[in-house]
């Protein structure tokens, strides 16, 4: 299956056409014909373009289609078609044991053959939340999850697994920065259009190579921080807004044990503390109270910058994920997402830029906002979603393993299944 996804993803990248005018009926016809092409060998020469078949010969295509049938049973019917342009859209095909989404791209010129095809989402017919939770519980290391429906009275907890367990959440902490920025804008203290210098560089991200001091709006920094998880943007915003104010948002948004994670470290400070050369400093920091930690940061500021970090010493294996981290429980993260739902304003479109899951799965929702976090031994995913009928939900989950890197695609697949089940 991994080979299939990789092959189809390659097609999606290599064979994307220039979008031109084409009749909707032509696209719908190609969408309908996808069912028969997936069902049995034959007709590939008239369905796919020469360009497609040069990249994926008929024999290879038939093997890929057969692999899908082996895993999911016979294709039964064409499901929903979500047209994005006259030549591009997402087509769902219902198999015996799953519904699979494909991005389908047709040539704008007659005979409008298919030039791009990419598998973008799978929803098993026989799936249920108990199976998803069992899959999460079976992961090595520690896992925790909370799923809630959100309303005027706050979260109503639907599914939980160690939901009050403090977990390392990686870049999920950037949602606290976003929340404080949204609060400051709503209070008239800041404007999204305010310009500040890019003043604190960190690994990694696009802005690392941007000139020091480059003028950037708060909105641009927030977008880079959330959609790209840019650490330079996060550190610049955290310190520009004021660490004290962002720390206050941790409690304001409903974190049950803020002292476990305060003060919120910049990413550069976290990288520096995780370095083997700073092991004694890290132990002192982890054992200290929040006020003592703040004093440690101030006293050792020169050692806790990106320029002092040997990134190779902390980038390959899980490092201090139980002591130098941004800690929260799944319930804490759900309450933060609910705060953003009620108070986020223009922060919500920023959260929706990167959905965190395949496009076909994300489009099951009226709104999908996402921010996750990952590093060796850590992955966290946090979703704020609105169903087609207007109901709001939040899902927050983390997987920590201090002994080994985590299997990120496996975790993403489990969370995608949970979202798809919730969307039904």
Please name every model-derived segment.
Residues 121-139, 311-424:
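Structured C-terminal helix/loop/strand segments within mature extracytoplasmic catalytic/sensor domains
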Residues 17-37, 126:
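Short, low-complexity N-terminal intrinsically disordered segments enriched in polar/charged residues
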